[in-house]
């Protein structure tokens, strides 16, 4: 795909992705100003908060994409227990899944520490992208995520769901920019591109195993 076509795809996609949450924030802010019950106000506040988060993720994706293109994606390495970041994400996504009692979130953290020297925030970013996708495409069943040691010095992370699954012939395409298998789903189509690039920049490997109607497992080392 030429650079011009990529730019056109970017502009067309972003105009929709920016307008949708902005319209929701503006519209529901107006409704909240005239709301009379606390229940009504809470509902509007939740919708505004959800769209604020969506807009922030969009801005972060665009910023990271520009850094990738410029070759200046920033990494800050530190020593940490992989289980800590799993539990952090369990708290965050567990609250969100409370709204859908048909889906169970299973965090497969370990009692024994799994110490690693890597870029903690970037690993959280990748897992967050994968968990967001799992939530979007899983209406019933469960979402599992965790990590385990691979050999003596590699840590293997995974996010598995019982969602719609991805056809074999589409599995490579999902890592292309702006690609969305379901056009009706919200999102920029940048999350998996960014995730794969981050993992590769950390010297790791990124993959997917999926079967239509049974779900998907995304994994990286």
Q: For each of these PLM feature ranges, what is it?
A:
Residues 1-32:
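Primarily the dimerization/phosphotransfer
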Residues 27, 166-178:
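Short conserved segment of the HATPase_c
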Residues 50-55, 59:
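Short alpha-helical segment of the dimerization/phosphotransfer core of two-component systems
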Residues 66-77:
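Helix-loop junction within the histidine kinase core
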Residues 134-135:
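Short helix-loop "hinge" at the ATP-lid/N-box region of the Bergerat-fold HATPase_c
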Residues 203-209:
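Glycine-rich ATP-binding loops of the HATPase_c
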């Amino acid at each position: 795909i030429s650079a011009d076509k990529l730019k056109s795809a970017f502009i067309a996609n972003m105009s929709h992705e920016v307008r949708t949450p902005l319209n929701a924030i503006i519209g529901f802010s107006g409704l909240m100003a005239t709301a009379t019950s606390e229940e009504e106000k809470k509902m509007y506040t939740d919708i505004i908060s959800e769209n604020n988060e969506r807009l922030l993720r969009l801005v972060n994706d665009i910023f990271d994409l520009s850094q990738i293109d410029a070759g200046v994606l920033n990494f800050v390495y530190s020593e940490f227990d992989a289980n800590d970041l799993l539990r952090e994400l369990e708290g965050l996504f567990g609250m969100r899944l409370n709204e859908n009692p048909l889906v169970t979130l299973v965090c497969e953290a370990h009692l024994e520490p799994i110490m690693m020297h890597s870029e903690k925030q970037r690993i959280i970013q990748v897992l967050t992208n994968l968990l967001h996708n799992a939530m979007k495409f899983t209406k019933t069943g469960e979402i599992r995520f965790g990590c385990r040691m691979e050999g003596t010095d590699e840590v293997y992370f995974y996010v598995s769901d019982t969602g719609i699954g991805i056809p074999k012939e589409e599995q490579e395409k999902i890592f292309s920019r702006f690609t969305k298998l379901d056009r009706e789903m919200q999102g920029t189509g940048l999350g998996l591109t960014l995730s794969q690039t981050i993992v590769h920049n950390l010297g790791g490997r990124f993959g997917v195993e999926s079967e239509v109607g049974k779900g998907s497992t995304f994994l990286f080392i």
